[in-house]
Amino acid sequence: MSASYLPSILVPLVGLVFPAITMVSLFLYIEQDEIV
């Protein structure tokens, strides 16, 4: 199966993308809170 290499790509991707989304959503939440 060609899916054996999938975790080696998926783990760093999730490890980088998930914190990035969390930081951006937190930043937008703080910015909206300051504007209001």
From Swiss-Prot:
Protein name: Photosystem I reaction center subunit VIII
PANTHER family: PHOTOSYSTEM I REACTION CENTER SUBUNIT VIII, PTHR35775
GO CC term (a single one): photosystem I
Keyword Transmembrane helix: yes
TM stretches of this protein: 9-29
Coiled coil feature spans: none
Compartments it resides in: Plastid, Chloroplast thylakoid membrane
Organism ancestry: Eukaryota, Viridiplantae, Streptophyta, Zygnematophyceae, Zygnematophycidae
Keyword annotations from UniProtKB, A to Z: Chloroplast, Membrane, Photosynthesis, Photosystem I, Plastid, Thylakoid, Transmembrane, Transmembrane helix
Entry's family note: Belongs to the PsaI family.
InterPro entries in UniProt: PSI_PsaI, PSI_PsaI_sf
Membrane topology qualifier: Single-pass membrane protein
Function recorded in the entry: May help in the organization of the PsaL subunit.
Gene Ontology BP terms: photosynthesis
